[in-house]
Amino acid sequence: MKFGRLGELKHGYNAMTTRDSDMMMDIGYQVMDAGEELSFQDPEQETAFVILSGQAEIRWNGQSEKMHRDSLFDENPYCLHVPRNTKVTMKADTAAEVLIQKTDNEKDFAPKFYRPEDVQADIFGGGVWSGTATRTVRTIFDYSNAPYSNMVNGEVINSPGRWSGYAPHTHPQPEVYTYKFDRPQGFGACFIGDNAFKISHNSWSELSGGNSHPQVTAPGYAMWYSWMIRHLPNNPWNKTRIDDPDHEWLMQPDADEKIWSPTKK
């Protein structure tokens, strides 16, 4: 269990987690200037590139695509996912920020370029608990559409004052959250097991397997976060969810009838 803050991002690579940590993944933000060109090629790790802002051209194996993003909150992402030892070149057409996720994988697979229309977006928590945990969950790739990968990559949009990762639950696989707000002074709270941490812009949390991990954002501030899971050997995350027994009653159809409200008499 760990929590960290990057503050204002610097030009270049801004590291958060490393492959030799409990998270088993290299994760960081690559900040690029307009016109800058960079190449990446990891001999041992698969890699996912998710554009967060700006516009860039990305090239691999003789192919080329444009990635762009004006809003984390209103737009689904572009993502390139490649196996180990694949050379990828990015050229920023404008100032750009890219999330990079990597982990060990001996499997060779065909690179996959995900466009916004390829990303699954679901509304979770709708119609229950007076809407206090309604959020948008985006899944770029997971075990269902990329069983060859050792990773999962997706995003959550928390509306102001709402919860996510709720009701409290666990899974054995490690997970990393990286956070951004619609305003840089935005804040929220991250609960990891029995510990709580203040979420700020460009902070991140490392969720060890077996810990519940609900999140909440303050009223007035919308929160985006990337959720990245590392599969375990012979134990992939396949939408794995173990509900906290203390809060299982919230999952019952009549839960709203049992929740106190000032309008009830």
Predicted regions and their residues:
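Generic beta-strand structural signal
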Residues: 78-80, 86-88, 94-97, 136, ...
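A short glycine-rich, His/Asp/Glu-containing loop-to-beta-strand
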Residues: 6-39, 127-176
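Short, structured patches in soluble enzyme cores that scaffold and shape functional sites
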Residues: 84, 92, 100-105, 141-143, ...
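Extended, compositionally biased flexible segments
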Residues: 27-29, 34-91
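Double-stranded beta-helix
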Residues: 96-136, 226-265
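Conserved metal-binding segment of the jelly-roll/cupin
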Residues: 73-93, 103, 199-220, 228-230
